[in-house]
Amino acid sequence: NELQEAVKASCKAEKGTIADNDSLNVVYIIGESFIKYHTNLYGYPLLTTPRLTKEKAKGNLYIFNDVVSAYAATSLTIRNTFCCNSLMDKEKWYHTPFFPAIFKRAGFDVYYWDNQKTDVTEGLTGFTTNSFLYNKTIASLSYTASSDKTFRYDDQLIQDYFKNKKPTGKYNLIMFHLWGQHIDAASRYPHN
């Protein structure tokens, strides 16, 4: 079964090393249904992402211009994004390690805050979110901590992370899985 293969591949992940005289915080955001052509970060004339624009101006945000998801479905994209396989070389996601496990073995603290976590285990999305990302073995190999609840708004999820799990180590991988543009814009932010 694919999930068992993914667990085996992640268990075999090589232990990496990191320099003792440096520190690094990597923030990985799964934005969900983000349409780059509707954001001024990619040249859209309206200021639709003012906070991201400020972060870019401060040098805190790198904009990728040549990345395209291989799939239009979250479940397939997440499995192939979180594993180290090459789709170009026709490698299967479950034959390669889960990249957060590699970071953790290298000495990083790894945090995963997910606003789409659900108790549903049926269907394609349920399989991805629960059976894969929250498999007990993969989770113990990969996460220092993960969120145990979801929020109405994405900014509440991020606030919860910084309130409850500020990074304490020198090396941190912080991952946020947001609702993003999956839901109606009027429902994405508080009206105040």
Residue ranges, per PLM feature:
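Active-site-proximal alpha/beta segments of enzymes that process anionic O-linked groups
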Residues: 1-28, 33-192
